[in-house]
């Protein structure tokens, strides 16, 4: 077997060092599942949340290791915001389903499928199936009405939701959204 050239060896060492740095201090998906999501009722959801959080944190660390700035930093932040928003949206769904099971949902939004309150909500035999048909906006409103989250967190989540929705490029252009490091930090803080 032919030995690797010094350039290949150096390149591999560099890649390994960046990978070690990116993984340092973020925990494994299994650790994140236990540390951050043990309150989530659904086992599959808990695992998916931990994997998504791991990916977002790993991208953050990778951006640090590569000293990402400008367009590269914007790309890193965009993906992190989308992931943090997805985590928040899923956590709200889980908490709403748990509150529904306990009969503690408040307000009237939870009785309607849409935020305009035109289509009655049919929770049916499996509330998890019903909740999957709702929007992030609906989940924020129901959570706030039910006291699951306060108005400050609801405002932060609406901001994250709007940033996440700029995955639709025409909306990004229309809204004039520019991704910057603080945006990912705020999304991460709201998720916590």
Regions found by a protein language model. Name each.
Residues 1-78:
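Charged alpha-helical initiation segments
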């Amino acid at each position: 077997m032919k030995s690797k050239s010094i350039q290949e060896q150096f390149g591999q060492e560099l890649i390994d060092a960046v990978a070690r740095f990116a993984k340092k201090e973020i925990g494994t998906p299994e650790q994140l599942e236990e540390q951050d999501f043990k309150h989530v009722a659904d086992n599959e959801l808990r695992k998916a949340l931990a994997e998504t959080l791991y990916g977002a944190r790993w991208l953050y660390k990778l951006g640090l290791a590569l000293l990402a700035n400008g367009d590269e930093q914007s790309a890193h932040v965009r993906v992190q915001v989308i992931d943090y928003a997805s985590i928040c949206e899923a956590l709200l769904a889980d908490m709403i389903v748990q509150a529904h099971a306990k009969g503690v949902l408040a307000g009237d939004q939870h009785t309607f499928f849409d935020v305009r309150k035109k289509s009655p909500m049919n929770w049916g035999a499996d509330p998890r199936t019903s909740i999957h048909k709702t929007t992030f906006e609906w989940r924020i409103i129901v959570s706030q009405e039910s006291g699951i989250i306060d108005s400050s967190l609801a405002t932060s989540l609406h901001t994250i939701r709007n940033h996440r929705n700029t995955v639709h490029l025409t909306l990004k252009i229309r809204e004039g959204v520019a991704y910057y490091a603080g945006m990912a930090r705020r999304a991460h803080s709201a998720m916590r």
